[in-house]
Amino acid sequence: MNRKDEHLSLAKAFHKEKSNDFDRVRFVHQSFAESAVNEVDISTSFLSFQLPQPFYVNAMTGGSQRAKEINQQLGIIAKETGLLVATGSVSAALKDASLADTYQIMRKENPDGLIFANIGAGLGVEEAKRALDLFQANALQIHVNVPQELVMPEGDRDFTNWLTKIEAIVQAVEVPVIVKEVGFGMSQETLEKLTSIGVQAADVSGQGGTSFTQIENARRKKRELSFLDDWGQSTVISLLESQNWQKKLTILGSGGVRNSLDIVKGLALGAKSMGVAGTILASLMSKNGLENTLALVQQWQEEVKMLYTLLGKKTTEELTSTALVLDPVLVNWCHNRGIDSTVFAKR
């Protein structure tokens, strides 16, 4: 079994809905919504993209025949629903051209859709351009994943030039570049560094869903690094960390998104759109995966409309004026990190 298929099997094995920091955020219910479902517009826009719903499928897989089947199904679902989809890391196809079709199948199924290509931060300008050319990607995701690399038996050990390489790519390619974590979250300091090198967008991708340290540790013979299973900031904390950067960077959120309520909470905390991966992957890998996942996406579209209505909001942009209350764990984090946690409850 190659590493890509190992990741798929382990992600499925470890996937379970569990409590996370989205449960520490509560909306303030208002009895008079003064809204109607048929008046709600759940579309969103960021960078140069207009999207019919405020969530997307985040980077998952590619580089094997099993992964090709999943990407084909994602392409079909995206065409049917208008979903933006990001591929898994295309590094495998850059090393072995015979694997290119495991990613290109998504474009074949969805020729006019929005698809992001994904590469690691250790790659350079030429690899970035080749990744975009694989299937005429609309944007480039560059993932940063130091904890995963360190736990991965064959992972990278030198991260000294990542920022320099990202900056060079930002200057060289003609499409937007989104820097994405892989489930470990982002801090204020990280966002400041990304802004300083000209990055336009960041997907803070926090802890709370799929743990790639857990997955990579399961691939180690002794499995001795389990203490890193929950390393990092949650998606909610990462969005709180991003508050002072949301006017300078396009902020996207992902990591541990289980349902439509999590999506709307992330939007209320300032994300322009929310990415989903683990929940979608688990659905696709179940019996009747394609049909079930298409139904799930359509269900979420309707539920998001209901939630906007419940909150008395007619557009995605209005959600950032919705009152919400953070529990003491989140308030304590904000206090220690110099973030004003009181503003959310008074909006």
UniProtKB/Swiss-Prot annotation:
Lineage, uppermost ranks: Bacteria, Bacillati, Bacillota, Bacilli, Lactobacillales
Enzyme Commission number(s): 5.3.3.2
Binding site for FMN: 59-61, 89, 118, 180, 205, 210, 256-258, 277-278
Protein name according to UniProt: Isopentenyl-diphosphate delta-isomerase
Keyword Isomerase: yes
HAMAP family the UniProt entry points to: Idi_2
InterPro entries tied to this protein: Aldolase_TIM, FMN-dep_DH, IPdP_isomerase
Assembly: Homooctamer. Dimer of tetramers.
Organism: Enterococcus faecalis (strain ATCC 700802 / V583)
Annotated gene: fni
